[in-house]
Design a protein with these regions (language model features):
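A general boundary/transition motif marking the beginning of the first structured unit of a protein
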Residues: 10-14, 38, 54, 87-90
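Intrinsically disordered, low-complexity, charged terminal extensions of DNA damage-control enzymes
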Residues: 1-37
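Structural motif
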Residues: 34-43, 90-93
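Active-site substrate-recognition loop segments, prototypically the cytochrome P450 B′-helix/B-C loop
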Residues: 46
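Alpha-helical ds-nucleic-acid-binding substructure associated with the helix-hairpin-helix region
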Residues: 19, 54-55, 59-131
Length: 135
């Protein structure tokens, strides 16, 4: 229900400030509900990194190939063979670096959704900002 309160707040604020066109648009669009990803946290962050600065179609194609590699991944640390698979999937050197920083990060691997939800906004920010490619 929080999304409905956010919608009402934005609508009321636009009216208060005299932004009638914006208020009408907010009213017309209605409340937006954000869906929570069902992916594990590491996969979710990996998909976000891959999708940065790409067209939707390119990101989807590269993610499909990368997701397959990740699901088959039995590696315990970064290595040349895995990096080559990522490169063949269409990832740049920099994105491979970022992806390795996520998939081999023990803190990310071990954290639960419950722990993430318990974090304050500042704690969550600090937790994510330390990760290369996000921070």
């Amino acid at each position: 229900m929080e999304y409905k309160l956010a919608h009402k707040f934005l609508y009321d604020k636009a009216v208060d400030k005299g932004y009638i066109q914006l208020a009408n648009h907010i009213k017309k669009v209605g409340p937006l509900k954000i869906k929570v990803s069902k992916m594990d946290f590491v996969s979710h962050l990996s998909k976000i990194i891959i999708g940065q600065q790409l067209s939707v179609q390119s990101a989807a194609a590269i993610w499909k190939r990368t997701d397959k590699i990740l699901k088959e991944n039995k590696y315990k640390k970064e290595n040349i063979k895995l990096n080559q698979k990522f490169k063949d999937a269409g990832l740049s050197r920099q994105k491979i670096e970022y992806l390795n920083g996520i998939i081999f990060n023990k803190d990310l691997i071990n954290i639960s959704k419950k722990e993430l939800k318990r974090m304050s906004a500042a704690e969550y920010f600090d937790f994510l900002i330390q990760i290369k490619g996000i921070g």
